[in-house]
């Protein structure tokens, strides 16, 4: 096999890898020849998954870890460093938690819950893995974000905030750590068919609305996210960094395709059709001296529908 399309001899850490998208990512990376260490908060799920991978001949080990705990993160990275001789090629920050509520109902505990698991853990793991990734001579970080970090999505504002933060973190690290031979990218899935998303997919009205806005007309599968993650870790993707790629069946680009007016308005935040003077007022402003530092921007009349 062309070495550009192989991970043989490379090492990886996948957080939250015992089920769902994380499980699929482990299988994909292992299939390309990587040696992998997995962490998960559930010891039962982890042991079951490790047993399955052993039967398949994959080189996978694992540790129980609550990524929201700083001491446990540090202990995990010590284990990884020892196991892989101080070198790591791939970090996949996959763990994500969600509590869906209206913004006015979120509590301080809800905020801390999302930030510690979705943002702080990813940030700290990046810091801890930096010397190992640098030592490998070929490092790749993948943040599993969400379309909720790209567009407004009915999943809770705090969740969207945390997933958007991962996208920006990928951009920053891509620039800051390029000199160390480390790439950083994010993948942003739509709702994927995993145990975590079943409560949403069992909601008939939610699923109908979701699929009506997804051009491919179906829910994605975990291996459809995992295949992109694996590609971004391959030498074949060596010039791709700082990017966010949506794995969403086309949802985020479906700004306006023909549909009945009621369907159009259901996708428009203000729930009405715009007027010509609401566009012309912006055009006039952009021509004024007051807009003298605005240039090269694309202003979309349908912006409220597309966000």
Curated annotation (Swiss-Prot):
Catalytic site positions: 159
Keywords: NADP, Oxidoreductase
Sequence positions that bind substrate: 146
EC number(s) recorded for this UniProt protein: 1.1.1.-
Entry keyword annotation includes Cytoplasm: no
GO cellular component terms attached to this protein's record: cytosol; peroxisome
Binding-site residues, NADP(+): 13-37
GO molecular function: oxidoreductase activity
One Pfam family from the record: adh_short_C2
Class of the enzyme per the UniProt entry, highest EC level: oxidoreductase
Organism superkingdom: Eukaryota
PANTHER family: NADP-DEPENDENT MANNITOL DEHYDROGENASE, TROPINONE REDUCTASE
Family: Belongs to the short-chain dehydrogenases/reductases (SDR) family. SDR65C subfamily.
Protein name per its UniProtKB record: Tropinone reductase homolog At2g29340
Protein's organism: Arabidopsis thaliana (Mouse-ear cress)
């Amino acid at each position: 096999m062309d070495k550009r399309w192989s991970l043989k001899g490379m090492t990886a850490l996948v957080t939250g890898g015992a089920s769902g998208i994380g499980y699929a990512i482990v299988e994909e990376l292992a299939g390309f020849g990587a040696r992998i260490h997995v962490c998960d908060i559930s010891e039962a799920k982890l042991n079951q998954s490790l047993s399955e991978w052993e039967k398949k001949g994959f080189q996978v080990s694992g540790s129980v870890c609550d990524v929201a705990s700083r001491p446990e993160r540090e202990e995990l990275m010590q284990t990884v460093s020892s196991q892989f001789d101080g070198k790591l090629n791939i970090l996949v920050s996959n763990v994500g938690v969600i509590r869906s509520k209206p913004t006015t109902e979120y509590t301080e505990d809800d905020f801390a819950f999302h930030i510690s698991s979705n943002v702080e853990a990813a940030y700290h793991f990046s810091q801890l893995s930096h010397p190992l990734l640098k030592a490998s001579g070929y490092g790749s970080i993948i943040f599993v974000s969400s379309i909720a970090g790209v567009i407004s999505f009915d999943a809770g504002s705090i969740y969207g905030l945390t997933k958007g933060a991962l996208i920006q973190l990928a951009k920053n690290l891509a620039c800051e750590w390029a000199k160390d031979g480390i790439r950083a990218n994010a993948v942003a899935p739509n709702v994927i068919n995993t145990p975590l998303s079943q409560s949403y997919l069992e909601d008939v009205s939610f699923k109908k609305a979701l699929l009506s806005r997804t051009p491919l007309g179906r829910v994605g599968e975990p291996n459809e996210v995992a295949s992109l993650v694996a590609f971004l870790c391959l030498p074949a993707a060596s010039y791709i960094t700082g990017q966010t790629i949506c794995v969403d069946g086309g949802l985020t680009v479906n700004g306006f395709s023909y549909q009945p007016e009621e369907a159009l308005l259901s996708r428009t935040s203000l729930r009405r059709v715009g007027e010509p003077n609401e566009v012309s007022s912006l055009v006039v402003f952009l021509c004024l001296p007051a807009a003298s530092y605005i240039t090269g921007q694309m202003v979309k009349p349908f912006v409220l529908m597309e966000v």
